[in-house]
Amino acid sequence: MTNFGAAFAAVVAFSLLVAGDASAAHRRDDGGLALADLMALRYAADRAEIENLQARYMFAVDWQDPDAYASTFTEDGVLDWAGGVVSGRAAIAEEVHGMRATFAKRESADAPKRPARLRHFISNVALKIDGDHATGRAYWFEIDNNTSTRAPIVSGYGHYDDELRKVDGHWLFSRRRINNEVMESRAAGPANPAW
C-alpha cells in the first residue's frame, strides 16, 4: 500500500469511527491489514522517529555539537531554556556555540584527553501525535563525572515540554522548553505535568 493509500485508509477509518460505524475500522483492506492496525503502525513509526530525535538531541548535547543540536529543530523552532528564549534554527546554533565556549572555559586541564564529561538521559516519554503535529513531555537527568574522584553524580534533572512538527517526512522540535528542577525559576509547579 502506498503512503497515500495508508493515509487515505486512516482518514476513512477515522471518518467511519466519527460517523458511528466502529466495526468498519476493524475490517481488512485489500492488503490484509485492518484500518485500525494501519493507524497503530503509523503511530508506532512516528513514536519511534520522535524517540530517535530525542536521542540525537541528547548525543548532540553531550558531545557539545551545536550544529547537530540545532538540526533537531525546525527552521522556525524555539528553544526555551534557562538562558532565555531563542527563535530560529540559526539562532539556536549560535546560542549553543556560545554555550560551548562558556563550558570550555570551565573544563579542567585534562578535558581534551577525556570523553564528554556529561551524559544526559531521557525517560518517561509521553507523546500525543495528531497527524504532522505532536506534543510531548519527558523526564531528563544528567550525570557528571567531573568530580575530583571522577565518581558520577546526578548534577541536574527536570522535564521537557515539547511541540513537534513533521517536516518533509521527518519529526523535528518546533518548540522545546527545558524545565530544570535545580533552578527554582525553571522547576515544575505543583500540578502533574502529564496530561
Regions found by a protein language model. Give the residues of each.
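Bacterial N-terminal signal peptides that target proteins for export
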Residues: 1-9
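Short, low-complexity N-terminal intrinsically disordered segments enriched in polar/charged residues
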Residues: 24-59, 63, 67, 71-75
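A beta-strand edge to alpha-helix "cap/lid" segment located at domain peripheries
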Residues: 25-38, 109-195
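A solvent-exposed, acidic/Ser-Thr-rich amphipathic alpha-helical stretch
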Residues: 66-140
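A structural signal for alpha-helical segments
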Residues: 45, 84-87, 152
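Cleavable N-terminal signal peptides
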Residues: 11, 22-25
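Bacterial N-terminal signal peptides
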Residues: 8-17
